[in-house]
Design a protein with these regions (language model features):
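Active-site "cap" helix and flanking loop/linker of ATP-utilizing ligase/carboxylase catalytic domains
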Residues: 1-73, 84
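Generic beta-strand/beta-sheet core signal
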Residues: 48-50, 79, 102
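Generic C-terminus detector
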Residues: 81-85, 90-144
Length: 144
């Protein structure tokens, strides 16, 4: 089993179960089928911040600034980043960051994602603005 990103990064913050214990039981042959996978009543949204030109030609080595608030409903996963000798986070790949946020509905989750993305800066940052339009259109409050 492979837990891909951004899929796993989007789902894991919603889990209220000790997932490591369930994986350990599975790997050791002790999964008995009555384990509960509890999840939050919130929804989760993810948008990738990539380098301009990805997936073709893109430049790396640009300093990244993070000006966003901290919250348990915000996770920023580093994919294509590195840290230089001075401790500065740099862009170091095509898919640079995954910004994942939770909310009570898809609109609030995606609005928070785009707010956080607006507070992250590096030269050539690019992110799609049409992510999630399908669920935002098809799900109303309480339908998730």
């Amino acid at each position: 089993c492979r837990f891909g990103d951004p899929e796993c990064q989007t789902i894991m913050p919603l889990m209220d179960t000790n997932f490591v214990n369930i994986l350990y039981k599975c790997a050791s042959g002790n999964l008995n089928g009555d384990e509960e996978l509890l999840s939050s009543s919130k929804v989760s949204a993810c948008v990738i911040a990539s380098s301009k030109g990805y997936p073709e030609n893109y430049n790396v080595g640009y300093p990244i600034t993070f000006n966003n608030d901290e919250s348990e409903d915000i996770q920023v996963f580093h994919s294509g980043t590195s840290i230089n000798k001075e401790g500065i986070v740099l862009s170091n790949g095509g898919r640079v960051l995954s910004v994942v946020c939770q909310g009570n509905d898809f609109d609030s989750a995606f609005n928070l994602v785009y707010k956080v993305l607006g507070d992250i800066n590096f030269e050539g940052i690019y992110f799609r603005r049409d992510i999630g339009h399908q669920v935002r259109k098809n799900f109303s409050d309480g339908d998730h």
